């Protein structure tokens, strides 16, 4: 979007036509409200950016099908010129006409027609240049079908529009749409407007509306419409004095037959504008982030750089995009409906005044005044930025231009000031509503994202603090490593040819996050369908499973106007977190995943694990929808956004920690209930505190050895050329264990049945060496740095017999022989070694032995005794022997 600069923002409102409540669609579901349909169609208007068009910013839905639209606005319009009654020069007429044609031509290029062109909708900025307002009303209302008022003004409607009349569908279940107006209809409207500017007065003012329409239709019988209009309004002398170019222009616009009337594109290239067009360089839309063309191709700098900073009183806020300014305006307390209420555009009527005077037995009522609220109020209210500017008055100019190359090592988190670093410690919900904080984060992320992928490392660093909601979609794409010409790839996929999956997709979409207005709109459904189908078609080795629609929802919501980016994000997300989950036979992948999850529950919360296993409430009964959809099936979108902000920074094992964190929030209720109550509890999941869930899942992740979540069916290591260079920017929090180079000390794959038989997870010998710091602290890869005063995080329990232990053991380990460790009841036999074990309760305990069965059984006994963080050394002591790290106790003399 363009910067706000000298323009302002305005709000206008209208009502969508109400639908009957007792009618269902052809699919048996209630009809989608017209306001929802309009809201969905509106979104594409936000992407149409041109100097001659007022930028659309937002639309909100109120009560009783009310819609409020926010858009770029200018105080002056051609209406003001007409009100002054001054004649406009021929050269100025040609300039105005050319600028209007520029806007119309760009709209037509995007498949849109204005249809409501009038002097009040042709705005003038402070430099006198044209900006077309309300150009999207005809498009968003489905050519006027979804509203009870006509689109357009009687005096400016083209003859073919009047001849068609106002068509309203009689049956709401049928798609009876009128024939849409074409680009040539706008040229007639432009011709009437230019005629009015030439003569300095409005036409048809003495005629009733019906007479006006009738008069326009009768113009088909005359040869020279311009002369007839001049004679009717007594201004023939003025018309005769106009330049030949202007008269020719008026005649071309006011051609009665649409077939003989030019399009805006054709008229723009007419010889009439041969001189005018030279003063207007062609408009090139800036290349997007994921573009196949160089983003800096059209970058130009002034010859004298000092010209950029000559004005000391720069309005830095006005240099930000309209979208950003509007977002900050809302954070600073801005409310569209409230602004309209203050200007008395929205008026509430006491309910008693709406009662009828007389009601018959059959329900027919009489005596009610006509409700005029459904008609169009064309007023646009200017939104005041005073409150926002007041909030930002203490923000210095340097905040709008952060330096990205400076060494900011003195700041704990961010490139922001010390106050912002302090604000970064506030709860996320407060940070996201803080105007100053969000301004700084948006400006910083905007600059970093414009330098993507060069600034990929810094994007990762800043995302660990938080992600500004306004830029979440594009930031997620950067975190997922999306690059290249994504639009061309998406366009190349066949999304039209019917496939067997179509039926299932059609069934699933109307049930996916339909509480959200955007995703429940017909436009949202169509985009869902295309993105899902593109993914299915482009992954022939995978299949569509129910839940894929939920997985798609966050990406589609954040990139509603960029299906290609939503598809690219989804295609990057699934291999990382859900590798092979969508195979036709995915049972081995799912079973391994759930088994590792069970081990994680036992590792972090043995008491809860014991209880769930005793009542038979296994993860297969509740966790498949969690992981298959990465929690999008169980949480609303606003919670998913905060959850995934952290998930995308973690590796593929992080979802296990999220799952355990959810269970721990429900811990008391789960421990107090049996199988049936737990099933009921998870059928309607209680409210989960997502911020707490994220905080606890990070803590759980830090306590989990990297190799404990190893899965043989996880994504294999990528080639260097496939990783997009992201690996270098990731911390150990983000890199998968599978990505690390394989060695003799790495974990080995085991059969699924053997994995299921073990309650506690295995860890690799290299993890054990790192955690014990046997190779020195410089090689530690764990997320938590060990301080000098802290106790060891880990205890090694060697369960071999004492003779084997004395021949060689891991430094710092204790010996608890398996054969004599437990009583018949399963309790630990008390001895100095078990006392040490009890003192380490709460830290990581690694069981080491010769026989796998014994180590697994010993670990299971400890879990039964509610020892947390118990794991098994993969490969036993034999894995450590070749390293030369075993020690022999000094002989007792």
Swiss-Prot record:
The UniProt subunit note reads as follows: Component of the FERRY complex.
The answer to whether keyword Cytoplasm applies is yes
Q: What does this protein do?
A: Component of the FERRY complex (Five-subunit Endosomal Rab5 and RNA/ribosome intermediary). The FERRY complex directly interacts with mRNAs and RAB5A, and functions as a RAB5A effector involved in the localization and the distribution of specific mRNAs most likely by mediating their endosomal transport. The complex recruits mRNAs and ribosomes to early endosomes through direct mRNA-interaction. Also involved in the modulation of mTOR signaling and expression of mTOR complex components. Involved in the control of actin-cytoskeleton organization.
Q: Where is the Rhodanese domain?
A: 790-889
Q: Where is the Rab-GAP TBC domain?
A: 466-651
Q: Does the keyword Cytoplasm apply?
A: yes
**Would you tell me the protein name for this molecule?**
TBC domain-containing protein kinase-like protein
Spell out the subcellular localization from the entry. Cytoplasm; Cytoplasm, Cytoskeleton, Spindle; Midbody; Early endosome
The Protein kinase domain, residue ranges: 1-274
Q: Name one GO cellular component term.
A: early endosome
């Amino acid at each position: 979007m363009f910067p706000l600069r000298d323009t302002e923002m305005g709000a206008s409102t209208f009502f969508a036509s109400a639908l009957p409540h007792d009618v269902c669609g052809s699919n048996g579901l209630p009809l989608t409200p017209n306001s929802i349909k309009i809201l969905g169609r509106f979104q594409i208007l936000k992407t149409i950016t041109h100097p001659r068009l007022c930028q659309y910013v937002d639309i909100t839905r109120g009560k009783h099908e009310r819609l409020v639209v926010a858009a770029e606005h200018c105080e002056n319009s051609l209406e003001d010129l007409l009100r002054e009654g001054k004649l406009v020069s021929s050269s100025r007429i040609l300039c105005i006409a050319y600028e209007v044609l520029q806007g119309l031509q760009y709209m037509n290029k995007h498949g849109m027609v204005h249809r409501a062109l009038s002097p009040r909708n042709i705005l003038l900025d402070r430099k006198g240049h044209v900006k077309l307002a309300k150009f999207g009303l005809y498009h968003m209302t489905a050519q006027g079908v979804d509203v009870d008022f006509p689109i357009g003004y009687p005096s400016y409607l083209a003859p073919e529009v009047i001849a068609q009349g106002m068509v309203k569908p009689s049956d709401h279940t049928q798609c009876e749409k009128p024939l849409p107006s074409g680009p040539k209809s706008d040229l007639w409207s432009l011709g009437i407007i230019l005629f009015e500017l030439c003569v300095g007065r409005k036409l048809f003012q003495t005629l009733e509306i019906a007479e006006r329409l009738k008069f326009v239709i009768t113009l088909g019988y005359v040869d020279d419409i311009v002369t007839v209009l001049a004679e009717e309004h007594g201004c023939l002398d003025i018309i005769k004095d106009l330049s030949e170019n202007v008269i020719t222009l008026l005649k071309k616009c006011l051609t009665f037959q649409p077939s003989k009337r030019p399009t805006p594109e054709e008229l723009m290239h007419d010889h009439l504008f041969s001189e005018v067009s030279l003063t207007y360089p062609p408009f090139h839309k800036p290349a997007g982030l994921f573009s196949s063309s160089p983003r800096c191709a059209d970058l130009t700098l002034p010859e004298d750089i000092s010209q950029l900073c000559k004005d000391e009183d720069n309005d830095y806020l006005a240099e930000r995009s309209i979208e950003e300014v509007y977002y900050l305006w809302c954070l600073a307390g801005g409310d569209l409906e409230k602004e309209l209420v203050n200007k008395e555009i929205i008026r509430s009527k006491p309910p008693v005044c709406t009662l009828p005077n007389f009601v018959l037995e059959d329900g027919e009522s009489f005596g009610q005044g006509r409700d005029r609220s459904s008609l169009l109020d064309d007023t646009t209210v200017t939104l005041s930025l005073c409150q926002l500017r007041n909030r930002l008055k203490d923000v210095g100019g340097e905040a709008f231009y952060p330096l990205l190359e400076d060494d900011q090592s003195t700041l704990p988190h961010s490139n922001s000031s010390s106050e912002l670093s302090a604000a970064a410690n506030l709860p996320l919900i407060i940070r996201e509503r803080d105007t100053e904080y969000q301004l700084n984060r948006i400006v910083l992320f905007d600059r970093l994202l414009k330098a993507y992928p060069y600034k990929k490392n810094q994007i990762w660093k800043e995302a660990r603090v938080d992600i500004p909601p306004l830029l979440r979609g594009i930031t997620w794409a950067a975190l997922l490593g999306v690059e290249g010409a994504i639009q061309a790839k998406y366009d190349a996929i066949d999304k039209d040819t019917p496939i067997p999956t179509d039926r299932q997709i059609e069934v699933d979409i109307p049930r996916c996050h339909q509480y959200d207005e955007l995703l429940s709109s017909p436009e949202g459904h169509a985009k869902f369908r295309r993105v899902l189908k593109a993914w299915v078609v482009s992954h022939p080795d995978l299949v569509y499973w129910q839940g894929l629609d939920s997985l798609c929802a966050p990406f589609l919501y954040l990139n509603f106007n960029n299906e290609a980016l939503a598809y690219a994000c989804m295609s990057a997300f699934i291999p990382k977190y859900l590798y092979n989950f969508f195979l036709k036979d995915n049972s081995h992948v799912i079973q391994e995943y759930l088994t590792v999850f069970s081990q994680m529950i036992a590792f972090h919360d043995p008491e809860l694990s014991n209880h769930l296993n005793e009542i038979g409430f296994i993860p297969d009964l509740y966790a498949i929808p969690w992981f298959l959809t990465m929690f999008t099936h169980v949480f609303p979108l606003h919670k998913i956004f905060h959850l995934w902000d952290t998930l995308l920074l973690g590796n593929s094992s992080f979802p296990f920690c999220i799952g355990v964190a959810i269970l721990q929030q429900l811990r008391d209720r789960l421990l107090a209930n049996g199988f049936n109550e737990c099933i009921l509890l998870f059928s309607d999941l209680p409210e989960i505190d997502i911020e707490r869930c994220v905080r606890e899942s990070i803590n759980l992740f830090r306590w989990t050895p990297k190799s404990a979540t190893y899965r043989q069916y996880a994504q294999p290591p990528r080639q260097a050329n496939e990783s997009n260079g992201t690996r270098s920017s990731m911390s150990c929090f983000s890199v998968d264990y599978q990505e690390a180079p394989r060695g003799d000390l790495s974990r080995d794959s085991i059969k699924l049945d053997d994995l299921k038989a073990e309650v506690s997870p295995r860890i690799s010998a290299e993890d054990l060496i790192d955690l014990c710091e046997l190779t020195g602290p410089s090689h530690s890869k764990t997320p938590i740095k060990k301080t000098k005063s802290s106790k060891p995080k880990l205890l090694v329990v060697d369960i071999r017999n004492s003779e084997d232990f004395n021949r060689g053991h891991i430094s710092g380990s204790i010996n608890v022989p398996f054969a004599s460790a437990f009583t018949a009841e399963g309790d630990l036999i008390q001895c100095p070694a078990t006392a040490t074990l009890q003192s380490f309760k709460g830290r990581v305990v690694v069981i080491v032995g010769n026989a796998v069965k014994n180590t697994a059984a010993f670990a299971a006994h400890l879990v039964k005794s509610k020892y947390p963080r118990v794991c098994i050394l993969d490969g036993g002591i034999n894995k450590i022997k070749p390293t030369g790290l075993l020690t022999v106790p000094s002989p007792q003399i």
